[in-house]
Swiss-Prot record:
Recorded family membership: Belongs to the ureidoglycolate lyase family.
The keyword Nucleotide-binding is assigned to this record: no
Superkingdom of the organism of origin: Bacteria
Protein's name according to its UniProt entry: Ureidoglycolate lyase
The gene coding this protein: allA
Cofactor: Ni(2+)
Catalytic activity annotation: (S)-ureidoglycolate = urea + glyoxylate
Organism this protein belongs to: Brucella anthropi (strain ATCC 49188 / DSM 6882 / CCUG 24695 / JCM 21032 / LMG 3331 / NBRC 15819 / NCTC 12168 / Alc 37)
EC number: 4.3.2.3
Annotated GO MF terms: ureidoglycolate hydrolase activity; ureidoglycolate lyase activity
Gene Ontology biological process: allantoin catabolic process; purine nucleobase catabolic process
Keywords for the protein's UniProt record, in alphabetical order: Lyase, Purine metabolism
Amino acid sequence: MHVETLVIEPLTKEAFAPFGDVIETEGAELRLINNGTTERYHDLARVEAAGTEARVLVNIFRGQSFEAPIDIVMMERHPFGSQAFIPLNGRPFLVVVAEDDGGKPARLRVFLAHGNQGVNYLRNVWHHPLLALEQKSDFLIVDRAGKEDNLEEFFFSDTTYRIETTKPA
């Protein structure tokens, strides 16, 4: 099996734009509400919920922590809805995404999300399941429920993608 090393990139709105939204206050539209006592950072992610009897779910995932090296042997995507991951413990995590190439993930990229950043994967975006760093961490997840199966998985058969370090290049 061929091993390809992935290089970690900083998570920025511009770099992540083809895959979804970076959820953070930096650069967001600020609105004062509640008689000026609360700052609202407005419209941070494009939440999608399509299909029969579709609705938005809010869950908490508790992710086990990973240490390098991390082998990426599969990816997943959600054809009927977006999926957002917002860290609740202020800890970093890795975000692995890929372009679609004829129904298969291709050209993988990995980003380091700081504990004050979340991500929202758009519908049909290939991504790896949660990769918490440092220690077990909780994440608020905004997801989609509905009649249709909203999970498609792909397992690599000829290449393992490896993250050698958890620090950006």
